[in-house]
Amino acid sequence: MNDIWWQTYGEGNCHLVLLHGWGLNAEVWHCIREELGSHFTLHLVDLPGYGRSSGFGAMTLEEMTAQVAKNAPDQAIWLGWSLGGLVASQMALTHPERVQALVTVASSPCFSAREGWPGIKPEILGGFQQQLSDDFQRTVERFLALQTLGTETARQDARTLKSVVLAQPMPDVEVLNGGLEILKTVDLREALKNVNMPFLRLYGYLDGLVPRKMVPLLDTLWPHSTSQIMAKAAHAPFISHPAAFCQALMTLKSSL
């Protein structure tokens, strides 16, 4: 089995694993790497099949998490953005002793809309899967544009995300399809009731993929977790609001 691409950066005494979202790679953290690297030892990861972690096919959430866990430090804060939030959450469920704190960013335990649950309509996710086989590049670009919609720096933020994708080899259609399948089918709402490490959830008020309506529902479901909504951010708050984003992580670190 191939190894996944993994880079450590910074010299802080606290380890922080950063997991990117669908279609992207670890370069997405470039704009906050310097700032965070002075406080943490960062573990920058390309998820299996993405970026420089080539040679992997489509995986289930459990398989993806097991692959990432192999390279991970014994103890770290695990931060996952969007799809990466599901991987970080799965890590907290399967290896709680290795997760000092769990941070999910613009992520949902159940991305797909269900009865009484806000999310992305399953037919939209299905549509993305269909379009992937028709026009691969265009579909990924549309998904990226959705992520920054509404922010004051939307155009610039979308360009940043696009440059991250283009900087590395594109994932295979099979891998992207597998990622959408995870977003469409996984539901960790009940399972995450049982995690007992510090748990911080960060959201963008303008996020079109992870609706803020779910925040109070999860506050009730997971009273042990803390939520923070960033007022002018959308789906990529670390790109549009890097200072506030880093501050939230420093505050978490000082509370551990």
UniProtKB/Swiss-Prot annotation:
MF-aspect GO terms: pimelyl-[acyl-carrier protein] methyl ester esterase activity
Catalytically driven reaction(s): 6-carboxyhexanoyl-[ACP] methyl ester + H2O = 6-carboxyhexanoyl-[ACP] + methanol + H(+)
GO cellular component: cytoplasm
Domain called AB hydrolase-1: residue spans: 15-242
EC number: 3.1.1.85
Family statement: Belongs to the AB hydrolase superfamily. Carboxylesterase BioH family.
Name listed for the protein in its UniProt record: Pimeloyl-[acyl-carrier protein] methyl ester esterase
Organism encoding this protein: Salmonella agona (strain SL483)
